[in-house]
Amino acid sequence: MEFWKMNGAGNDLIVVDDRQDAIPDEKWPEIIRTVCERHMSIGADGFMVVKKPTYGGDYKMLFFNSDGSMGEMCGNGARCICRYGYENGLAGEVQKVETTAGLVTGWRVDRRLYRVRLNDPCSMRLDGKAEVDGATYTTRYPRILRCIAGLLCWVICPHRPLRPERYFHRMFQPYSVRGRGA
């Protein structure tokens, strides 16, 4: 499998072209967990798969977190994918990239610099209910609770149905401990 390892503002990302659909979608999470593991493989913060466009973009980008879960978007990754798209002839200096969060526009500023226009947030609901591990929590304002494996604030977007998220940064996992140092 050919890949590019890219870096955008401190995030290191792996990019793979799968416009030919050579790898079944259900295989990606296992592949991603394996290749993103630091010290044991290539290691990366995230993984992007380039696919054929489906709704008017130059190409489609699927973003995955290093644990294999699909994410909607990564701004630093969007700039990387624009450079990849330009350098591989998928798009010109101005390009439209399809993401699960919507269409993103990217511009080539110079040889190494790319700018992106991320899509606007649709709406935010500051109250609601979240079910985590069988317990229901009511939210009144956005908060991140380290003892709860969830973010109690949802951004509603027409491109993605509301669903409980199960994978979070290790700092917010209920079983993690984050030291502050001496």
Walk through the language-model features, giving the residues of each.
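A glycine-rich beta-to-alpha transition motif near the start of alpha/beta enzyme domains, typified by
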Residues: 1-110, 148-182
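A structural-propensity feature for long, helix-poor, extended segments
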Residues: 104-121, 125
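Active-site-proximal beta-strand elements of phosphoester/diester hydrolases
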Residues: 115-117, 138-140, 149-153
